[in-house]
């Protein structure tokens, strides 16, 4: 008589490991409009690597192969020839997880930043090499002048900032500066 029955048997949330939740969060991300034109790329994340490289946009495809462009080829060369590091022994990440022409860079950075911070928080890397001016500003709250070419420590992480790959391609004299920056990172790695 006027009563209704409601089935309150709720589905319990799946207790997935945190890293699986984050990976699925990145893979299924739709926090900004970039995902409409590109599939999110987690990057090569090795939590035990001693060295991490971070670019603004992905340099790897979803199969973890380097993209077929000059920036990705330059990064691969830096990792293998300058740092003499096998790809399996490093992490290659990006701030933005989708590669497309920017629609609203600030909004996209805000949407993706927590994914990258989680990856860094769960990384054992001794040195994190960041490319370009946007990353040190967003991760460390430091300008180019304050961060480029020096080891900057934040919590237990050590960052080295250098020129963006695209800037080095446009202005080859920046490659010499970047090489000097990389030598600082190598010295730091060898000391620790």
Enumerate the predicted regions with their spans.
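A polyanion-binding, active-site-adjacent surface
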Residues: 1-192
């Amino acid at each position: 008589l006027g009563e209704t029955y409601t089935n309150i048997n709720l589905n319990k949330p799946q207790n997935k490991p945190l890293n699986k939740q984050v990976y699925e969060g990145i893979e299924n991300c739709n926090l900004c409009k970039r995902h409409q034109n590109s599939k999110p790329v987690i990057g090569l994340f090795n939590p035990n690597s001693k060295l991490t490289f971070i670019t603004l946009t992905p340099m790897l495809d979803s199969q973890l192969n380097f993209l077929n462009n000059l920036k990705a080829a330059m990064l691969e060369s830096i990792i293998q020839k300058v740092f003499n590091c096998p790809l399996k022994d490093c992490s290659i990440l990006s701030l933005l997880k989708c590669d497309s022409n920017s629609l609203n860079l600030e909004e996209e950075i805000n949407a993706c930043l927590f994914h990258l911070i989680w990856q860094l928080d769960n990384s054992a890397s001794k040195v994190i090499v960041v490319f370009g001016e946007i990353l040190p500003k967003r991760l460390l709250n430091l300008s180019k002048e304050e961060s480029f070419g020096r080891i900057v420590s934040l919590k237990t992480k050590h960052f080295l900032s250098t020129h963006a790959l695209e800037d080095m391609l446009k202005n080859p004299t920046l490659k010499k500066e970047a090489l000097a920056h990389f030598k600082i990172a190598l010295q730091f790695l060898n000391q620790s």
